């Protein structure tokens, strides 16, 4: 699972004149890119995107024959890489005539338009290194049992992978991805959009259970989640999955809402996915912040969760209920019904003990004033004991964190 799974671009004279200036300096970060003549094996070890970047550098330097050699090596390793095939055609044509644009066609087909979009997305990825010393603001806290977290940045067609070492998160890799044909913010069945929110990988579907369209496998996520359902959003079947055998990668907006990776990248990703726990944060653009800001946000939300636990344990029902928002729902009851039930239940108890562990705290993307808390709840009282995995959605209401939704996860 390497960082190499990040970048490349293809194109012809007019398109490359702009793109290659932007990516040229960054290509030097690949040590092999400075070699006079890297071997095919060296290029393939660097990964498909890096191989294409090397070819583009050669095109910028007017080394058409060398670029063609690079591309042919890339195609030999990945014969179904359609973008590379298009670049090869451009390079062959460049020997005899100037090229106007990628694909060298003014009346481009839908496929050519898609490949041009992929080329632009690859350049954008190449230019957008994860900021050093910064982290996505969403991932406030992961339990030690959750080893990795995923954050999708749709603006850059990139899925970032972060590793949890028990004390902090570290960027380890990223992958080019395809999202829905109509962009983000899924609302209803069939709108061909990818949802924005906090989700989790809930199952694994092996290749044997799928058609070839989904490639090497699929990992469904829990869309619609509780917040989606509260807002009346519907639809189903949002997966992370691969590509058909005859397709290396797809344009940045080409799915029916799923998150699509190359089969090689999905195979790498599958090694670290934990069914039932790996969080997947999907956003339009990542908000990168300092570790100090994350710590402040984490402490603020952790304090709210702890105060809720303490007030529940105290059997002071009034104090306990002050932690719930005016528009609270558990899926069946609103705040008034919830209040009445809690007063009745707590009146019958002589003591309550509430323990929480394996706490996950995540800010909701696009909603600066909302967060998701998931934890193991160990409840014991004078007449009932149970243990459940609980999920709460917290919002800022009148300057304080309050619970908008609560239920079993």
Please state what every model-predicted region is:
Residues 343-391:
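Surface-exposed, charged secondary-structure patches
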Residues 203-306:
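Exported/periplasmic cell-wall-interacting domains
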Residues 386-409:
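Short beta-strand edge/turn micro-motifs at domain boundaries
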């Amino acid at each position: 699972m390497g960082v190499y799974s990040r970048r490349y671009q293809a194109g012809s004279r007019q398109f490359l004149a702009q793109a290659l200036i932007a990516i040229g300096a960054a290509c030097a970060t690949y040590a092999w890119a400075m070699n006079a003549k890297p071997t095919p094996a060296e290029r393939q070890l660097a990964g498909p995107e890096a191989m294409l970047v090397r070819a583009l550098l050669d095109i910028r330097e007017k080394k058409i024959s060398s670029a063609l050699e690079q591309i042919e090596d890339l195609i030999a390793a990945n014969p179904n890489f359609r973008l590379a095939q298009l670049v090869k055609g451009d390079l062959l044509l460049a020997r005899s005539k100037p090229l106007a644009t990628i694909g060298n066609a003014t009346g481009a087909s839908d496929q050519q338009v898609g490949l041009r979009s992929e080329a632009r997305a690859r350049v954008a990825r190449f230019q957008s290194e994860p900021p050093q010393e910064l982290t996505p603001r969403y991932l406030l806290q992961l339990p030690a049992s959750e080893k990795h977290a995923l954050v999708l940045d749709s603006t850059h067609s990139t899925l970032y992978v972060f590793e949890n070492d028990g004390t902090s998160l570290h960027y380890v890799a990223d992958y080019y991805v395809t999202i829905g044909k109509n962009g983000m913010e899924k609302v209803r069945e069939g709108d061909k959009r990818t949802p924005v929110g906090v989700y989790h990988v809930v199952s694994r579907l092996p290749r044997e259970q799928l058609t070839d369209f989904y490639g090497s496998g699929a990992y469904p996520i829990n869309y619609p989640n509780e917040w989606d359902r509260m807002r009346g959003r519907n639809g189903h079947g949002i997966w992370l999955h691969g590509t058909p055998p005859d397709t290396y990668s797809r344009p940045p907006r080409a799915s029916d809402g799923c998150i699509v990776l190359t089969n090689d990248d999905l195979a790498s990703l599958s090694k670290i996915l934990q069914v039932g726990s790996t969080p997947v944060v999907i956003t339009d653009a990542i908000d990168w912040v300092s570790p100090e800001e994350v710590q402040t946000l984490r402490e603020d939300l952790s304090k709210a969760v702890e105060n809720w636990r303490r007030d529940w344990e105290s059997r002071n029902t009034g104090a306990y209920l002050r932690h719930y928002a005016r528009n609270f729902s558990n899926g069946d009851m609103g705040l008034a019904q919830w209040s009445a039930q809690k007063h009745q239940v707590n009146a019958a108890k002589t003591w309550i003990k509430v323990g929480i562990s394996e706490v996950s705290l995540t800010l909701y993307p696009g909603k600066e004033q909302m967060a998701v808390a998931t934890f193991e709840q160990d409840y014991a009282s004078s007449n009932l004991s149970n243990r459940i995995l609980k999920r709460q959605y917290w919002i800022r209401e009148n300057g304080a964190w309050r619970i908008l939704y609560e239920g079993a996860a």
